[in-house]
Amino acid sequence: MLRHPRCTKCRLCEKECSNKVHHYDATQKIMVADDEKCVNCHRCVSICPVKALKIARTNCTYRDDDNWTNQTIKEIYKQAESGGILLSSMGSPKRMPIYWDRLLINASQVTNPPIDPLREPMETRVFLGKKPNAIVRDAAGRIDTSNLAPQLELSMPVMFAAMSYGAISYNAHKSLAMAAQQLGIYYNTGEGGLHEDFYAYGDNTIVQVASGRFGVHERYLNAGAAIEVKMGQGAKPGIGGHLPGTKSIGDVSRTRMIPEGSDAISPAPHHDIYSIEDLRQLVYSLKEATNYTVPIIVKVAAVHNIAAITSGIARSGADIIAIDGFRGGTGAAPTRIRDNVGIPIELALAACDKRLREEGIRNDVSLVVGGSIRSAADVIKAIALGADACYVATAALMALGCHLCRSCQIGRCNWGIATQDPALVKRLNPDEGSQRLVNLMTAWRHEIKEMLGGMGINSIEALRGNRLMLRGIGLTEKELEILGVAHAGE
């Protein structure tokens, strides 16, 4: 922590920092910072009235070693002291290939003129759910829609991904709900139930059923526009969830229907699901509970045999499959699992779309993907690889003020997002937060239209699975084969 001499010793940084980094030394009459406590959230830097603070990389590092890195050494020391599992938050920061950045989008030139989105209509709406294999007409020749499966209608192919009430604050949830309603998209409750105040946003809400069944009851199931069964999460495939008792207080515990102060532990498996047949029973139980009026989503992590898994899920009766990739975010996960388990969403998506098409069941389900969707360009590339829509979470949190300090698990978020401390929660204004989310998604929608028009395409549906619109660069032949795209120049 670097402090400029123009510091006025107003002590605002001391007041704003929940990690107790700053304090006033009355003896020397100066402000002092404890660098070991700093999580790099930039709260103090942002609020300093004279811009006297700057966070810089420390020079107090171990000798350079590509194998035994500074982080590795610190983690070994920490485990030697505690004997515990290392916990981390957000998505994996490891230097793994980011395939979005190795894919380039096509553009029309000369023979296939581009479309100007400012002057021509561009369709960004998408419908998620099972589609008919053929158009059916009634006796009068009109299209018969009476037997169509329930659909989610989105104004653009983006939704706010699952983040539970408890993992994030009341004000963060309210911001997401308000923005989803204004945008004509959906937000996901996560596995912590739905706060009583947010039932009013039910038409733009996806309610989630996870292995812990927290906050699940008949009214909850019928409150949303869709139900998502969480089988896995990209940041921690194969394990359950854990909300510490320090966050399970007040409305959080009441919403989850658990004793206040108790840890909310979701088991690794659903104890009633050990096969596709078991999953089918739950899917149809949920359909019965909602009188077949809402689509059922099954969410899984992107793992090694994901194509075969999605093939089974498509046959379970699910209407939508959500796939969460290796870089997906989380409020807390074991570090070793977050950084070493699962596969990138780009490869998983391409493999699943191909498998479902080959088996002739692609129209039976919609595919929604998440796991580090960072921009409108990532959305376009995902659609071209076969997705119907994308989940975003980390980008949405950044719009709310998250500075990616990766300390969600400690519950002292200085921006009022990943905390239940009332003094910190009130730092996030839901009205301002929802407007920032609306601004972000509006900007993405404009960019999506621009890129579609540049390709000479006027609808999302025309782009879905159209891998001719993509070219790879710097990828191996095997990677190109799995992605189903040609190399740049071909």
Where are these regions (language model features)?
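Active-site cores of enzymes that catalyze phosphoryl transfer or operate on phosphate-rich substrates
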Residues: 227-276, 281, 288
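Conserved, well-structured core domains of diverse proteins
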Residues: 1, 21, 30, 36, ...
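Structural beta-strand/beta-sheet cores of well-ordered domains, especially the beta-sheet scaffolds
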Residues: 156-161, 183-185, 203-205, 225-229, ...
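Conserved active-site-proximal phosphate/metal-binding subdomains
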Residues: 57, 63-110, 330-346, 354-366, ...
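Glycine-rich phosphate/ribose-binding loops and adjacent secondary-structure elements
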Residues: 9, 14-15, 19, 24-30, ...
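Alpha-helical scaffold segments in soluble metabolic enzymes
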Residues: 43, 175-182, 278-285, 312, ...
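Catalytic cores of large soluble enzymes that bind and process phosphate-bearing ligands
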Residues: 5, 9, 36, 40, ...
